[in-house]
Each structure stands twice: as C-alpha cells, then as structure tokens.
Curated annotation (Swiss-Prot):
A zinc finger (C4-type) spans 1143-1158. It is linked to Premature ovarian failure 9: An ovarian disorder defined as the cessation of ovarian function under the age of 40 years. It is characterized by oligomenorrhea or amenorrhea, in the presence of elevated levels of serum gonadotropins and low estradiol. It comes from Homo sapiens (Human). Preferentially expressed in testis and ovary. This is Probable ATP-dependent DNA helicase HFM1. The gene is HFM1.
Length: 1435
C-alpha cells in the first residue's frame, strides 16, 4: 500500500480517497473547534497562520508538495487562496442553506485558481464530446500549459507531486489506489453530487508490485469498466459546472479550542461507567452537554447518522437520575424507535450500561400480551415502537404506569413524515404532551418533575418545526443542528442515474442493473467490504449470481479455505456455490443458521461482497465501506413503490466502519427520472411534513375514548398540539388548503376535516354525537381503540349476518387491512396450492375454490395450515405465518368482544369465541394435537403422540409415564413431567337442569359449572392465573340466551359456580345449546344440548305459526364445523278449519310437531261417545281410505286358514277418476324429490279438506294381498327403484332411533310416568328401526339432516311425529305379523327410514286423535285384548 506521507499518485489511478474534511457548523461562530480521529496532540497541530502560508506557497500545480487542506470561506474572502484539491471532485459534502448561492462557476474564478479543473475538463472533453447537459469548453479560459499530463505507469516519477495529507496516519487505516483520469470522467455539478462515468476498455488492473493490501479481495471484472452503450449517456448529467464542495472555514484548532470538548470526568462518579468507552465527548455531544445535563428543557438535535447521537440520550437519562433520589421507584423512561431492531439493539446495549447502577430495562414491541404490563411495572427504561406505545397509551387513564414517565426519548424523529408510521408517532407524542399537562394539573407543579422530551433526527431542513412541536407553553425546546462534517466516518454520497424507457418494467430495469454492479464495486469499494441492497429476495440471489459470473475476486489461500468452510456449513445449495466465489446473499426468508454464517463471514472481513434486502438495514448492524442501493423501487403492498426516506437513510447509514475506516461511500443506482429526487434527499433538503390528515379517523376515535376530545372545539385544540397544525400554517397547499388562507381560515379547514371523520365514526356507531356536537365513545369505539383495529376492518365486520361459520370468519379476517404488508410471491404459489388442494397430502380444513391468486387467499391458506398442524417447509411462509398470527390473535379477540357488545347472533358469537381461542393455541378447536399445547411438546412430538392414539388430555393422563417416554423417545422423567402438566389442567363439568316451574313462554334452567379437580389445583396449576371459561347459551332462533366469563379463581374458591337463567321460548324449537369455551386450551371445551319443556303451544291470536326446516342447529361433532345449518323456511300458517276443535295431543310445540291435527284441529266428536278401541279402529279405517300411494314393496301377510277372507275385496282395482286437481299437484311429486315433501304443510291441509270425497269413492291406496297373481299389472322394478333411491340417503344415518327413544324418555312430560312402560316396549320394537317393509310411505319423507345434527339434536322437525307413532302402536302383535314387519329391519339395523312408517303417521294426522289421558293402567289390558282383533275387523 502506498505510504500515507508525501506519496506520489497519478490521475490515471482508478481509485481515490476522499479527503478528511470538516464542514461549516451551523452556528454563527467565526471559528469552531475540531479534531480528527485519532486526535493528534496539541503540539502537533500547526498554527492557522502557518497553514495559510503553506497554502499560499502551493498555488501552482507543478510544485512538489501540496497539502490536502481546505481554504477559507468564499463568502468571506475572494483572494487567490481558493483551491480545489485533486480528489475534491469526488467530494459529496452538502452545504447549509446560507451557502447555497455561493457555487463557483468558471466565469467568477481566476484561471490559476481552477487550473487543474480546467485541465481535467479539457482532457475529458477531447474524449467525450456528447454529454447530457451543458457542454463545457474549458480550453478557452485556461492556457494550454496548465493542462494536466499523465504519469508514467511503470515509473514512480511524476511531473506533479502532492503531499497527500496534513497529518500522518498509519498505513493500516488508510491505503488505497487512486483514480486514473483516462478511465474516469467525472463532472462536478451544481447539485453537489458527483455523477461518474467510466470508459470501457481503458482501465487497467490496479494491482502492481508496489501495492500492499489491507484486504486481500480485489475485483477484476470481465470488461473492467462501463461502456457508453452499457451505461447510457444519461448517467452523467452535468447541467452546469460549479464547485462540487462546500467551501469551509479554516478551523482554528488551538489549545483553548480542544479544551471545549467535555470530559467524562464532568459526570458524577457513579454514572461514569455509562461512558467508559471514551475519555472525552465528541464535538456534537459536547455542544449538547450543558443543555442536556444542567437543564430540563426539551431538546431536539439534528445530526448525521453515526455521529454519536445515542450518547445524547444517555446524558439525558443521567440528568434524570441525578435529579431523582434513590431508590428510583416512581420514574419511567421511554425510548421510542421506528423499528423493533433498533429497540433490540438499544435494549442489549443499555442493559449492560444501566444494569450495574440499578436500572431495569424492558423491551415492549410487537403484539405483546397484556401480561407484560406486570413486567413493565418494575422496569425503569422501556424500549418500544410508536405503534405499541400508541396501543398502550390508549388506556392510560386506566393505567398509572404511563403517568410515571419522566423522560421520553424519540429516535429517528424525522420518520414523522413517513406516510404509514408518521401519523402514529405524531399522535403518540401529542398524547404524551396531554398526559404531561393533565398530570401537572393534578399534582403540585413545584414538586413534580415534568416530563421531558429529547428527540434525535437525521439532518432535516426544518428541525425548528420539530422543536416547536415538542415545546411546552412556558419553555421552548432547544434545537441543535449539526451538519455532515461531524460524522466520524466521512460519507461520500453518489447518485447514478440510468436510462429507463417507458415500456421497460421495473423487473427488467432491476435486472439490467445487475450487470453494472461489478463496475460500481470496482470503482468505489477501495478493496473493502461492500454491501449491496436489492429490492426483492429473488433479486438478491440473481444479483449475486451475476456478480460471481462477471467478476473474480483475488483471495489468499487462507481466505478461500475459510470461505469453503462457511460454504459447507450452509443449507442453501445456491448460497453454497456463490459463497465459495467470494459473494453471498442475506434476506429474512433464509434459514436462521444460514444468516448467522453469512453475517459472521462478512463481519470478520472474509466476505468481500454481500447482497441483501432492506431488512438487514433495519436489523443486524453490518457496516461496510461501500453501500450500494441497487434500484430505489421495491415491491410493497402488491405494487412497486419508491423506498421511503427512512429506508434510504437507514441503508446509507450502514456505510462506514468506525473501527476500520475514516471514509465511506454510498452509491444509489436509480432511474434518470428520479435522480434529482434522491439528490435532494441526500442533500437533506426534503422538508418534514405531516401525514396525520390522511389517517385522522382512528386517532380521533382513540382520543375520544380517552376523553381527551369531547367536542369539536376541543378536537381543533387537540390538532393544535400536533405537527400537522404547525406545518399547515406554514405550507397550507401541501394539505389541500388554499395558499392564501390566514390562520383562522386554516383552522376552519382543519375543523371541517375533523367533522368529516367524526361523521364517519358516528355512522358506524363508534361514537355518539348530540346536537351540541358533543361526543361520547360507544363500546364498539372503545374496543376499536383498545385492540388497535383500523376503521376499514371495523367497517368490514359491521356487515356480518350472524350465521357465519368458522370458514366464513377466517375468510373475513384474511381480508383485513392489517395484512396489507403480506405479499403473494410467485415462488410460493405451488406450496400454497398444495396446502389448499392435494389428493395425496393432508390439506387445509376449508379448501378454497380455484388456485391461490390473491393476498387474501394466501393469508387464509396459511391460517388454516397453522391451525391444522400442517408443516410448512418454506421459511419465508413460516415468517409470514408468524406475522399473520400476531395480528390475527388481536383481531379475533377484538371480534369476539365486538360481536358480544353488538348483541349479534349466537352462531357468530360462538364461532368468534372459538376462533379467538384457536388463534391463541394455533390449533383447530377439534384438533387431535392437543398435546402440542403442553410445554416441551412441538409439532414433531405431538405427531408421535397422535400416532399412538393419545388424542385427548384424558388419554394422555391415563397413559403410563414410561410408555409416554417410549412413544416420544425421551428419557425419564420426561413422561412424568408431561403427565403432571396434564394433571394440573382444570377439568370442568357442566350440569344443566330445568327447574320445575313451567310456563307458556318462559322456562328456568339451572346451570352449574364444576371444577372437578379444584382441590388438586390449590397447590399447582398448569393454566395461567388469567385463564377463564366462557359460558354461552343459545336457542334455536340463533339468539344468545346467556353469556358469562367465569375465571378459574372464582371456581377455585368453592369448586363450582351456579346460575339460575330464565329462558324465553324460541319460535323454531325448544332446544338450547350450552357451551363452555376455554380461553386458552383446546380440548377442555364442553358442549351440551337441552330440550326445554313449556306448558302450552306458542299461539298468535287464532293462528298457530308452524315453522319447519329453518331451525338453527349448532353441532359439535369431532370433525364437523361449528356451523349454522339453515335450510329454507317453508313454514306456513295453517288456519283451523271452522267447527274443528283442538286435538288432545300433548305435543311440546304444536307448531313444530308432525300432526296436522295440531295445526288445523279435529272435527267435533259425535254425540254418541265411542269406546276407546272402536275409536281407534275407526281411525285406522279412515286412514286406510285416505291413503293414496301404492305400496313400495309387496305385503305378504300370512293369514290363518280358518279366517274367512274374501281376496277379491282386497284385489287390485283401477282407481276411479280423481278430482279436477291432480294428485301430482297435491303432492308435487313430479317437481320435488320425496325428501322435500315433508316441508309442504299445505298438502296436508288440502287432503284434510276433502276427506269425504275420498271415503265416498272408496279408493284404497294401500292394498294387501296373499299371492302374486293380483300384482301382475304393476311394474315392480320401477316401484322398488323409486322407493330405494330415496331410502339410500337416509339409511346412512345411524343410531337415530335410539336417540329418539332416549329423548322421549328424557323429556319432562306430565304423563311420563303413566306412559313409561308403553314407551319402553315401543322403543324395543319400532323405534329400534323405522323401516317397515310391510308399510308404504304415503306422501312424505323426513327432512335430510347431517349426521352430526341428528346425533346432537334429538328433537328435530319430525321427531315428535315418530314419538307419537310409538305411543300409538299396538304392542301385542301376533308373532307372524312381527316377523314380517321386521324383515327389512334386520337387514339394516342402523337405518332410519321414515318412509315406511308414514302409513301410521298419516293416521295420526287425520280424523281422530288419541287422547293419552284416556290411557290408564286399568284399561290397558282390555285394550290389548281388543287390539288382537284389529286385523280381523279390517280384513
């Protein structure tokens, strides 16, 4: 490496080093103190006069020595002492505003002053004639003899020798090659940014025998340079020629000047350990020292990245600790940074610094559960983000913690102009100002320490506005502005503009930049580590691959071996190949182990180039000598957009390694059209503006919930405390106001803006507004503020109907605004489609139609995959899933509270409670992987437990501990620990009974929740102290009957909890669904059904409403969805026929039972009272007369030979002509399937209206026969196929008969005792199977139910029909008849075919009803005897 002292360098050298310079300080001081790291001794620093004399003696370029020293400010002097050092054409200093007009151009400067520049331009103009911008002709103003000459390449001689620097600095810090003028053409524009162009083919390799290497990685590109065709002319725009650096004052570095730096010894002894890393504070820290340590004024400092701003915060903390006596109990310090990574860094740093002196630190970021509030109670320093602190402070009136904050530290306060995050920061600071003012009014201001704001910002032009915003009424904030000169590592900033045609996509433009990376690295890296930021993860891999092909790195053998070792330790095969060649990539979608390997290799300097996404800039601190931002567009929210200024500054801030470098370079590669924008940005000329006016609605609601705002006037007053107000007064046009408005006009506009947002809130009932324009929060608005939910999400859930299933809710949640930052990437679609639908794998529970095409479908798929324990191999998808569940758990908790507060329907409330628990446990509510919730059990061990058949907590507890260890392949006492964990889970029992006080419209039930193991839980509990269960009861009308949360602490006191609940009668059914839902555990829930008994049917005037199939059924089968099965409501109101009386059926609900007589009544009884048995026989004959459907199967009843029966009487006879209205119109057989006919109550009404007509014509619709000869005219095959086509569906339902019999026995009918024997006998006969092979279905069939609903809801529509049929069936049938009746039943023991029993059902619905009150034990024997002759009477 060339020696740093009086070395020779040539203009032909490719690489250069920027001089160490100090820019003007903004203060109006004539001279400021400065020193360079490492600081020289005072005796070594020459006097200012000597420096000026030295400058005078080196005017001419041909002299042997020339110092790299800056001259006095052009504004002060116009002498001939103004020089531009050779390498200053690459200076990227940014002037303060007061020097903006002092740009030098050729007309205003003497020839000798700029001779070397003129020579440079002359030489360049001979090579490049065509540049965009102004063409320069320097030959006219500069004599030929001042033109520069080239140095000999092989000789160390030169016609122009310069002294490289004023102070000698060791070789290991500075060593570089210098730029070759033949290859490098650099124009210096008035914008203070250098645009650079290299000529293809002219550069030479810069490794020669005299060069020593600090880093052993040299870049050799294939082409070694840019060509004009590769880069395009637009890269080098030189609109005008002017000096590219800010002229500086020659700093007076004197003994007194150095003495103005503050020493750490000024800090009290017990706090000096905080600043133990250095003996003196740097210039910026020293300037801020007095204001921070000796006053309590609010403080704003603007300084470049890396200038030691963190120490400013530490000084402010030290001031507070000095003021507050020990112990520091009642103080909180809040550090707020825009990203979690900065909070983590600060947490790790300050935990070590402040821990020894007794301060506790706590990181509060992300969706932290509110349990962390208890930990924060004991923390002194809290690191948080604006979003998290916003959600915390929305409850500050309820929480005294926030009022204890005495110091509020804001890092990167310039992000307040960020479109998305800025409004949150602005609102939080304004709210903290409100907290301060309220606490001061509540306390004695003379004794209380006021809250202090200390804010740190990157260099911004309007820092005074930030200071004004942070000022309180009495004391304005101190504002300290520092420029780039105080950065410990001087940063050179380059913006390269590349042509991009209008038809060229962003993807294609990004690809073209990949081929220019090698030349940029070669030019600017100085053979030191380089960091390249790319827009996408795929772009990172592509760029690294292109560089490895285009360039070869010269590395030592040891370095190659170390890279080989790194390569073998990574999992990613692509990364392994690239890493061997000296490059690597890093992004958040990689395996954690791979990322750590790459970070380690880059940190120690073994890795020359690292490609990464912008996430690295926000997270891991990996500084580099050169930072390249390849393309300023990135993919966010489904479209390409420019990086925010925060992102750009954060990425640029990675340039410079204080422990290695004194200079660093940042290069931005962008399109020509946006080049000027980034020049302005890097010059820090972008004014900070507020974005609060675009996001006002959520924050207004939050302030109303806090009662900060109660009317419009206070709303405007609140806005006055924001940055929005300050900037609107100064720049109204930016906020859509007329530029000529005065203060009153702007305030009126702001008030109008407030009212618009307030009306939107009021429209969704989030706030209540009265005529006086006063506001009050509603419960919905309070929940929206507490759970930090966006207005758009609340708007979406206001449209729910109340019948949403789990699937519907998941779909709604997936479309929430909170998931806008989730992106659907091309390479993820295959994995997602496999999760959605794949016949060969386990897929998600509710598959979506079609392929995965949108962000919402991706979110939906990942939610279901996580809940279904389906492993996701893609690490990027795993990360997205974690982010989704952070937001999703908050949204689902809000949803369950919101639905409860809105008094929505039972089904959606139950499902929202279950879904909130699912998100918390990351399991479906019916999952077999209950063991995954236990400590030390992950998805792998959980799969092993499920494969062993242990799918519930009960089974796990009953399993031997050693067997568990065998299943899990773990050593003792692992199995014992698992068993203990399960043992100490709460075990609930739910008892529900109806209180025997019956009424027509209401019933009382007693619900008891029992904690079975409450004695065991007194000593130890697996569940958290905050665990609770929710008791929710709903009726058949989808209404919530009762909702209550029961905490474990309540149950632990007595072991049980009981509540008497009044239940109003539902229209559709008397069934109640009682559910006990655990808040944190899957596998503890209990679901029960209860059928409530009421005295009288529900009547409305003279009509009884009959509603059938539209009942809401909530079923909880093991693998069935918690859903609302809602069929079409085909119920009609049947009027009672004039002259009819009410039947004697004791149906629980006459409008839902299966009897027509319950709806339309029965004919009045004749005067001559018939006996019970004769009435029954008459009823049976009438039924036989009315029945109109031919039998499905032939009845072959074996008669005794002794019985004289005329077969012709029962033979087949053609039917007489039917009435004008055809039978198909009555029964709708041709149009409707048999399954739907049960829901046509008007059919029965019409049949009943003309019974005499059928009787008179003596049409026998059911015929019995003994032989085959009379059936010859029938098409048996068609009949049987027709009947069984419908039967097949029903026979799949198993066990229904038993359910019916048990439900009948379990119901609380008054006459239950007298009928018990009768029902038991019937249960053993007909109820066990409803398929009667001898009896044909007349005109109806049962509704179709799911298996789960049939199991769980015994009293469905039509069940009552079967019950009455059972009660009416004669018991003592002859053996022959029984044998024939149950022939088909034996074939299908589990089937439930209602078609076959409808012959008897039709009887029960027609002429006469059986009054069960007439059945007494005394009459039973006589009736049974008479019953033996029933068939004799018929046949």
């Amino acid at each position: 490496m060339l020696k740093s002292n009086d070395c020779l360098f040539s203009l032909e050298n490719l690489f250069f080093e920027k001089p160490d310079e100090v820019e003007n300080h903004p203060d109006n001081e004539k001279s400021l103190d400065w020193f360079l790291p490492p600081a020289p001794l005072i005796s070594e620093i020459p006097d200012t006069q000597e420096l000026e004399e030295e400058l005078e003696s080196h005017k001419l370029l041909g002299q042997e020595k020339r110092p790299k020293m800056l001259t006095s400010n052009l504004k002060i002097t116009n002498e001939d002492t103004n020089y531009i050092s050779l390498t200053q054409k690459f200076q990227f200093a940014f002037p303060s505003d007061k020097y903006e007009q002092d740009d030098l151009n050729l007309e205003g400067v003497g020839n000798n002053d700029l001779s070397h520049i003129a020579g440079k331009l002359t030489y360049a103009s001979q090579k490049y004639k065509n540049h965009i911008g102004t063409e320069i002709a320097p030959e006219k103003s500069v004599p030929d003899d001042t033109k520069l000459v080239n140095f000999a390449e092989d000789k160390g001689e030169s016609t122009s020798v310069f002294r490289k620097r004023l102070f000698k600095i060791s070789d290991n810090i500075h060593g570089s090659a210098y730029s070759n003028d033949n290859e490098l053409d650099s124009h210096i524009g008035s914008v203070k940014i250098v645009q650079t162009e290299m000529n293809k083919g002219k550069s030479r390799n810069y490794s020669n025998s005299k060069q020593k290497f600090q880093y052993s990685a040299n870049v050799f590109t294939a082409n070694n340079a840019f060509s004009a065709s590769e880069i395009g002319e637009g890269m080098f725009k030189a609109p005008s020629f002017s000096v590219a650096f800010q002229p500086h004052d020659i700093q007076e570095v004197t003994e007194n000047g150095l003495g103005s730096l503050k020493a750490v010894t000024e800090i009290p002894a017990k706090f000096r350990s905080i600043f133990k890393e250095f003996p003196y504070f740097n210039y910026i820290q020293s300037k801020a020292f007095d204001d921070l340590l000796y006053t309590d004024r609010n403080f704003v400092i603007c300084a470049p990245t890396g200038s030691g701003k963190t120490v400013v915060f530490e000084l402010a903390i030290t001031r507070l600790l000095m003021e507050v006596p020990l112990p520091w109990l009642n103080i909180k310090i809040v550090y707020m940074a825009p990203i979690k990574a900065l909070c983590s860094q600060r947490f790790d740093d300050w935990k070590e610094k402040f821990g020894p002196i007794g301060l506790n630190c706590k990181e509060l970021t992300g969706d932290t559960v509110m349990d962390d509030l208890f930990e924060i109670q004991h923390a002194h320093i809290i690191m948080t983000t604006p979003e998290k602190w916003d959600s915390m402070t929305r409850k500050w009136r309820d929480n005294s913690l926030v009022q204890l904050v005495r110091l509020f530290l804001i890092d990167e306060v310039h992000i307040v102009k960020d479109e998305n995050r800025g409004p949150t920061l602005e609102v939080v600071v304004s709210r903290m100002k409100t907290v301060q003012s309220v606490s001061q009014t509540l306390k004695n201001t003379s004794t209380a320490i006021p809250m202090r704001f200390v804010a740190v910002s990157a260099t911004i032009p309007n820092a005074e506005d930030i200071a004004e915003w942070l000022s309180d009424g009495e004391r304005p904030a101190v504002c300290l502005k520092m420029d780039e000169s105080h950065r410990p590592v001087k940063l050179q900033k380059v913006v390269l503009g590349f042509p991009c045609s209008s038809n060229q996509t962003e993807f294609k433009f990004d690809l073209t930049l990949n081929y220019k990376i090698a030349s940029v690295i070669q030019m600017y890296s100085d053979q030191k580590p380089t960091l390249v930021f790319c827009a996408t993860r795929k772009g990172v891999q592509q760029a690294a691959s292109v560089l490895v092909k285009d360039a070869k790195f010269i590395m030592t053998v040891e370095q190659k071996q170390r890279l080989q070792k790194y390569a073998y330790s990574v999992r990613d095969s692509k990364l392994r190949d690239i890493l061997k060649d000296g490059a690597a990539y890093h992004h958040a979608g990689m395996e954690l182990s791979d990322r750590k390997v790459v970070e380690g290799a880059f940190t120690v300097g073994d890795l020359p180039v690292l490609f990464t996404t912008s996430t690295l800039a926000m997270g891991v601190n990996l500084p580099a000598h050169l930072v390249v931002i390849k393309s300023t567009m990135h993919y966010a929210g489904g479209l390409f957009e420019e990086y925010s200024e925060t992102d750009i500054l954060q990425m640029i801030g990675r340039a410079g390694r204080p422990q290695f470098d004194t200079t660093a370079t940042a290069v931005i590669m962008t399109r020509l059209s946006t080049r000027d924008k980034y020049i302005q940005m890097l010059a820090c000329r972008d004014t900070v503006e507020s974005s609060l006016h675009r996001h006002l609605i959520e924050h207004l609601n939050a302030e109303i919930v806090l009662h900060t705002i109660t009317d419009v006037n206070i709303a405007v007053e609140w806005i006055r405390s924001t940055l929005l107000y300050i900037r609107a007064l100064k720049n109204p046009s930016h906020y859509g106001f007329a530029s000529g408005l005065n203060k009153d006009g702007i305030e009126a506009k702001l008030q109008e803006l407030c009212l618009k947002n307030l009306n939107d809130l009021s429209s969704l009932d989030l706030i209540k507004m009265d005529e006086g324009v006063n506001f009050k929060p509603t419960e919905a608005g309070r929940l929206m503020a507490w759970y930090y939910i966006t207005f758009e999400t609340v708007k979406k859930f206001y449209t729910i109907s109340g019948k949403e299933t789990l699937s519907d809710l998941v779909t709604l949640i997936a479309g929430c605004k909170e998931f806008l930052d989730i992106q659907l990437r091309i390479n993820e679609k295959k994995t997602l489609n496999t999760l959605n639908k794949d016949p060969n794998r386990i897929t998600i529970r509710f598959p979506m139609e079609g392929r995965i095409k949108t962000r919402e479908m991706k979110v939906n798929c990942l939610i279901q995959a996580q809940l279904g324990c389906i492993p996701i191999q893609d690490f990027a998808l795993t990360q997205d899933t974690a982010k989704i569940f952070r937001h999703g758990s908050r949204i689902t908790r809000w949803l369950s509270d919101f639905v409860a507060a809105q008094e929505k329907k039972f089904a959606v409330l139950l499902n929202s409670l279950i879904l909130a628990k699912c998100f918390r446990c990351k399991l479906w509510e019916n999952s077999l992987h209950v063991s995954k919730q236990l400590e030390k059990i992950g998805i792998t061990l959980s799969n092993a437990i499920v494969n062993a058949g242990l799918t519930s907590f009960k089974k796990i507890e009953e399993t031997d501990a050693r067997e568990l260890e065998l299943i899990l392949n773990r050593h003792p006492p692992f199995g014992t620990q698992i068993k203990e964990t399960v043992m100490y889970l709460p075990k609930y029992e739910l008892k529900v009974e109806q209180i025997t006080r019956y009424s027509d419209t209401t019933a009382e039930i007693l619900v008891t929740v029992i904690l079975r193991n409450f004695e065991q839980l007194q000593t130890k509990r697996t569940a958290s102290d905050s665990h609770y269960v929710t008791l929710i009861i709903g009726d058949a009308d989808n209404q919530v009957v009762y909702l209550h949360k029961i905490t474990d602490s309540v149950l632990l006191k007595a072991g049980s909890w009981a509540k008497k609940i009044a239940v109003k009668r539902a229209l559709k059914s008397e069934d109640l669904s009682i559910n006990l839902i655990s808040s944190e555990f899957v596998g503890l829930d209990i679901q029960q059904k209860l059928t409530v008994f009421y005295l009288e049917p529900k009547r409305f005037g003279n009509q009884i409403t009959m509603q059938r199939k539209s009942e809401t059924q909530i079923s909880h089968s093991k693998h069935s969805d918690i859903s609302t099965i809602a069929g079409p409501n085909k119920g009609t109101t049947a009027s009672k026929k004039p002259g009819n009386r009410e039947c004697n059926h004791l149906c629980k609900s006459k409008h839902t039972c299966g009897h027509d007589c319950c709806k339309i009544g029965v004919a009045q009884k004749s005067e001559i009272k018939e006996s019970t048995i004769s009435s029954y026989l008459s009823d049976l004959r009438n039924r036989n007369a009315v029945s109109s459907v031919p039998p499905v199967k032939r009845l072959k009843i074996q008669m005794n030979k002794s019985q004289s029966v005329d077969l012709k009487e029962f033979g087949f006879t053609p039917k007489p002509s039917l009435p004008s209205i055809s039978r198909s119109e009555y029964l709708n057989i041709s149009e409707l399937p048999i399954m739907e006919q049960w829901d046509q109550p008007e059919i029965y009404g019409k049949v009943r209206q003309e019974p005499s007509e059928y009787q008179d014509k003596e049409v026998l619709n059911v015929n019995f026969e003994l032989g085959n000869e009379v059936w010859d005219d029938f098409d048996d095959e068609n009949l049987e196929v027709t009947s069984f086509s419908t039967d097949t569906e029903k026979t799949k339902i198993s066990g229904f008969g038993n359910t019916l019999s048990s439900s009948t026995r379990g119901s609380k009918l008054p006459l239950q005792e007298s009928k018990s024997k009768f029902q038991r006998e019937m249960s053993n006969s007909f109820v066990s199977s409803h398929e009667m092979s001898d009896i044909s279905l007349s005109n109806s069939a049962m509704p179709k139910f799911s298996a789960s609903s049939m199991t769980k809801l015994p009293q469905q529509a039509g069940n009552a029909v079967i019950v009455h049929f059972q009660e009416r069936k004669p018991q003592n049938l002859s053996p022959e008849i029984e044998k024939q009746c149950f022939t088909f039943s034996e074939k299908n023991p589990n089937s439930s075919n209602y078609k076959k029993v409808d012959f008897f059902i039709r009887n029960s619905e027609c002429k006469k009803e059986v009054d069960f009150s007439m059945y007494h034990p005394d009459d039973e024997a006589d009736e049974m005897k008479s019953l033996l002759g029933i068939f004799d009477g018929i046949f």
